[in-house]
UniProtKB/Swiss-Prot annotation:
Pfam families: DmpG_comm, HMGL-like
Keywords: Aromatic hydrocarbons catabolism, Lyase, Manganese, Metal-binding
Membrane-crossing residue ranges in chain numbering: none
GO biological-process terms attached to the record: 3-phenylpropionate catabolic process; L-leucine biosynthetic process
List of residues binding Mn(2+): D14, H195, H197
Enzyme class: lyase
SS bonds (residue pairs): none
Protein name: 4-hydroxy-2-oxovalerate aldolase
Amino acid sequence: MAKKILLCDPTLRDGNHAVRHQLTRESFAAYCQAAEAANVPVVEVGHGNGLGASSMLVGECLLSDEDIFTISREHLHKSRMAIHLIPGFCTIKKDLTRALELGVDLFRVASHCTEADITDRHIHFVRNSGKEAWGILMMSHMTSPAVLLEEARKMESYGAEAIVIMDSAGAYFPDDVKERISTLVNGLTVPVGFHGHNNLGMSVINSVVAVQEGATIIDGTIRGFGAGAGNTQLEVLVAVFERLGYETGIDLYKILDAADIAEKGFNPVAPSISPLSIVSGLAGVFSGFAKPVAKAAKDYNVDPRDIFFGLGERKAVAGQESLIYEVARDLAKRNENSVEKGQ
């Protein structure tokens, strides 16, 4: 019997990073219809940084969370509607309660890879409300497999029904994935998943290795639409898993049709492994920093690659966008001092 893989599609959430959180009503409606037709089991929607995150700090969303959920819910019937949420951005009283009222099916409660403690109240609230909650560990390359397991066990103890690790910076090689996924699969009683980014061109093979090591949940976005160099490309995953004998339940032809719809409707620059994306992966810095890093480099007349490596040294994580300009200012000052000394 073929092994079943649950493919989750965060195109309408992670993909929002690629257009500065400006996906339109028409884009949400059209893509939800296409994903539903292709039998995509889970469709994640929202601001790129999740529920309640729209702000000047990380980017203001064109649509409100409420509008996004209402539009998406209207077109998702077989497919489950999921959201990403980070405690701190997302409050229980204001945001989570309303998301429940608007029909969200699956809540992916996320934290930095060493800060699972902050998810306790949110996971408990979702579970006590009768809905499904998963634990998401972001920037998972920044700690060891042993610590990841400790943090994942915390989420499991809070009631998380699955644990997904995110390679948020696209920094992993297959051996990194193998070590971490096998550790989690052997140490947890809930399903384990993997969310890849393609900064170093490894996202598809990393996803395959994750499945070979026991992961049963894999994330992918249509056309790789997402932060930085993009996510693991969903339609490629469907084709590759079909070739390898895994069962996803997704209609290959219809997901390829969805890719065409997205390409024409979203009007993004097609995800590619740009020089900055490579540096982001090497530095281990969140892929979504690419655009603000480029702007800061221009504003301060410094090399954006140096900004990325500076952010890596400071172990910057998503939500710390203010560090980008701090690093840029420090580099500009250092360059100015070097010029003065050389005179």
